[in-house]
Amino acid sequence: MSSVPLSVYLVLALILFCIGLYGALTKRNTVIVLICIELMLNAVNINLVAFAKYGAHPGIAGQIFALFTITVAAAEAAVGLAILMALYRNRKTVHIDEIDSMKH
């Protein structure tokens, strides 16, 4: 059975992170920005699992930390979507340019 080299995982994670970063910085829809942030977190999880597999001391610590970050990302997504729903109810929009001020 052939093993995939570490560099493949790192390049994949880099591509996913760059796509997420580009979307988070350029898009004006807050839902899309939230999805891009989640994509960046998934790229970090790929790195965690890859380094856990190919590191000097392979073990389960990388997978456990990846599961922890997935849990945190799920909570972040739930809170983010709840905030977006409240903003949409008040402002009738989800575009960043129109909801950037805190006053009502």
Swiss-Prot record:
GO CC terms of this entry: NADH dehydrogenase complex; plasma membrane
Reactions listed under catalytic activity: a quinone + NADH + 5 H(+)(in) = a quinol + NAD(+) + 4 H(+)(out)
Membrane topology (UniProt): Multi-pass membrane protein
Gene3D superfamilies found in the cross-reference section: 1.10.287.3510
One example GO MF annotation: quinone binding
Residue ranges of the TM segments: 4-24, 31-51, 64-84
InterPro entries: NADH_UbQ_OxRdtase_chain4L/K (IPR001133), NUOK/Mnh_C1-like (IPR039428)
GO biological process: ATP synthesis coupled electron transport
EC number(s) on file: 7.1.1.-
UniProt KW keywords: Cell membrane, Membrane, NAD, Quinone, Translocase, Transmembrane, Transmembrane helix, Transport
Enzyme class: translocase
Localization per Swiss-Prot or TrEMBL: Cell membrane
Biological role: NDH-1 shuttles electrons from NADH, via FMN and iron-sulfur (Fe-S) centers, to quinones in the respiratory chain. The immediate electron acceptor for the enzyme in this species is believed to be a menaquinone. Couples the redox reaction to proton translocation (for every two electrons transferred, four hydrogen ions are translocated across the cytoplasmic membrane), and thus conserves the redox energy in a proton gradient.
HAMAP family: NDH1_NuoK
Family classification: Belongs to the complex I subunit 4L family.
Quaternary context: NDH-1 is composed of 14 different subunits. Subunits NuoA, H, J, K, L, M, N constitute the membrane sector of the complex.
Name of the protein in question: NADH-quinone oxidoreductase subunit K
Classification lineage: Bacteria, Bacillati, Bacillota, Bacilli, Bacillales
